């Protein structure tokens, strides 16, 4: 279980800052695919008409987890930066901190 706080003081490479400032942390999420991308247009053109599936459908999935990407937004200048973490199965943003000697609860 990886638990990351919602704010983090780190270096801001923005033009106005260039110093350590507080950043707001969120998890990166992939946006919707563009329907105008060249590959998508080519694929749709090839799929149209008779003939069924024209390109191979990928089945040999190798990875169990994805790498966690953090999106850091500077509080003072709104500069957005991304930070990649290692692979983990359970990721939590702003969860409760563990205390020493406390019983583990699931």
From Swiss-Prot:
Residues 25-55 are annotated as: Disordered. It is found in: Cytoplasm. The keyword Ribosomal protein applies. Keywords: Cytoplasm, Methylation, Ribonucleoprotein, Ribosomal protein. One of its GO terms (biological process) is cytoplasmic translation. GO terms for cellular component: cytosol; cytosolic large ribosomal subunit. Pfam families: Ribosomal_L44 (PF00935). SUPFAM superfamilies: Zn-binding ribosomal proteins. Gene3D superfamilies: 3.10.450.80. One of its GO terms (molecular function) is structural constituent of ribosome. The modification N6-methyllysine is found at residue 55. Its main location: cytoplasm. Component of the ribosome, a large ribonucleoprotein complex responsible for the synthesis of proteins in the cell. The small ribosomal subunit (SSU) binds messenger RNAs (mRNAs) and translates the encoded message by selecting cognate aminoacyl-transfer RNA (tRNA) molecules. The large subunit (LSU) contains the ribosomal catalytic site termed the peptidyl transferase center (PTC), which catalyzes the formation of peptide bonds, thereby polymerizing the amino acids delivered by tRNAs into a polypeptide chain. Belongs to the eukaryotic ribosomal protein eL42 family. Component of the large ribosomal subunit (LSU). Mature yeast ribosomes consist of a small (40S) and a large (60S) subunit. The 40S small subunit contains 1 molecule of ribosomal RNA (18S rRNA) and at least 33 different proteins. The large 60S subunit contains 3 rRNA molecules (25S, 5.8S and 5S rRNA) and at least 46 different proteins. This is Large ribosomal subunit protein eL42.
